[in-house]
């Protein structure tokens, strides 16, 4: 959808402006770097960063786990499951309406149930592609996906865009090689800039408004699609006609 494409581009532009160019608003509301904010050289990143920021490995900020492997003949309870095709056919938000349903024992499923603040990352197929779930209730993730659980939930939106830098290139921080698969070790080893909490809080206020608008657009689009399909069915069955007057 064009509106959501524009909204997603806006969110990415905000992230880049604040955390790549470092022109987040300073205490006076002016762009930090452009207004002469203090910068220091970071040897890990080989670039300057704001003096009030730090750099740590992603593994210190999140827990990672691989998804569930299952067979079709298992018995137990029904669960929704996120597959790689759900990631590849979406942008940043997943609404769950197209998820498959599988049956597995609860004792097996409980280690793979997604939580509200989890981030999901494709291991293969579209390696490095990163998504958020609108609702994680009773939803598992498949073995070709890695789940990233931030230790601090307020960092989730920021970390999503840090991880989305993998999309397309999947370059490691050490060798810059292009990966066919993404592993937990690759993700844990990523060097991540950690902004001050008050800056993250300001970022969240804006990004959550954008996400809310994207969600509304998704709902509106699905409602219109449903109405269109129902009308087409009536037309095909001769139960409705188009007035040409």
How would you describe each model-predicted region?
Residues 1-17, 35-68, 193, 197-243:
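Non-catalytic DNA-recognition/assembly elements of restriction-modification systems
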Residues 4, 84-87, 142-146, 162-222:
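Glycine-anchored helix-breaking recognition loops at helix->coil/strand junctions
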Residues 21, 27-28, 154:
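Secondary-structure transition motif
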Residues 29, 71-78, 96-97, 174-176:
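Short coil/turn segments at secondary-structure boundaries
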Residues 39-45, 59-74, 85-116:
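Sequence-specific dsDNA recognition surfaces
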Residues 80, 89-91, 128-130, 242:
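Flexible loop/turn segments at secondary-structure boundaries
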Residues 83, 104, 109-167, 173-178, ...:
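A short beta-sheet element
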């Amino acid at each position: 959808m064009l509106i959501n494409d524009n909204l997603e581009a806006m969110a990415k532009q905000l992230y880049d402006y604040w955390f790549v160019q470092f022109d987040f608003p300073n205490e006076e509301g002016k762009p930090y770097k452009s207004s002469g904010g203090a910068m220091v050289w970071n040897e890990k990143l080989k670039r300057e960063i704001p003096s009030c920021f730090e750099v740590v490995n992603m593994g210190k900020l999140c827990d990672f786990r691989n998804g569930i492997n299952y067979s079709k003949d298992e018995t137990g309870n029904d669960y929704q499951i996120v597959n790689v095709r759900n990631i590849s056919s979406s942008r940043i938000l997943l609404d769950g309406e197209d998820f498959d349903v599988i049956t597995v024992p609860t004792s097996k499923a409980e280690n793979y149930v997604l939580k509200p603040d989890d981030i999901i990352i494709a291991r293969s197929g579209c390696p490095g592609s990163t998504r958020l779930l609108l609702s994680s209730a009773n939803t598992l993730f498949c073995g070709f996906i890695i789940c990233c659980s931030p230790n601090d939930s307020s960092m989730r939106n920021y970390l999503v865009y840090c991880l989305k830098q993998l999309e397309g290139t999947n370059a490691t921080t050490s060798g810059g090689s292009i990966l066919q698969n993404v592993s937990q070790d690759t993700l844990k080893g990523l060097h991540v800039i950690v902004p001050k909490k008050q800056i993250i809080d300001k970022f969240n206020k804006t990004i959550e408004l954008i996400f809310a608008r994207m969600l509304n657009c998704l709902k509106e689009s699905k409602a219109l699609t449903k109405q269109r399909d129902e009308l087409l069915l009536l037309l095909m069955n001769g139960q409705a006609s188009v007035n040409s007057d």
